[in-house]
Amino acid sequence: MKSHPLALFRYCPRCGSAAFTVADSRSKRCADCHFTYYANAAASAAAVVRNAQGELLLVRRAFAPAAGTLCFPGGFAEHGESLETTCLRELQEETGLHGHAPKFLFSLPNLYVYSEMTVHTLDSFFAVSVDDETALFAADDASA
């Protein structure tokens, strides 16, 4: 059986009451202070970069979850950040490359397990151009 996205949250984050119960498939409500908390999907963005030979740029994940696997450079959006900005920032942080002109390709819902908690995400993919591939290096969350 699929667990509720807020199953690990036992107390109301507003008043601390234990009367924090499931309201629907993605929210919990406090019977004491009437606060409702929704577990919305976390936004993420990934850069799809091709070189002149048509090869795709992938990075090897340095950390859990899925350490050692290959993925597109990317990560979670920060507060107040657009997905295009997220995509370019993550590309630079993980590879040293400065991208430009991100073009939306597609998005997919995903489940991301972190610290024993399943986070619902919405992963967006962007085609990104880079001017200088020679500046490439692994950094931040990428090991190679």
Give the ranges of each region predicted by the language model:
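A broadly conserved sequence feature marking short terminus-proximal activation segments
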Residues: M1-L8, A47
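Conserved Nudix-box catalytic region and its N-terminal flanking loop in Nudix hydrolases
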Residues: K2, N51-E93
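Residues immediately within or flanking Cys/His clusters that coordinate Zn2+
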Residues: F9-Y11, S27
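Short, cysteine/histidine-rich loop/knuckle motifs that typically chelate Zn2+
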Residues: C12-R14, A31-D32
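Short functional micro-motifs and their immediate structural scaffolds
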Residues: F20-T21, Y38
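Short linker/helix segments within small regulatory modules
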Residues: T21-S27
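Conserved N-terminal beta-strand and adjoining loop/helix that marks the start
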Residues: K28, D32-L56, F76
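Unchanged
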Residues: A77-K103, L108-A144
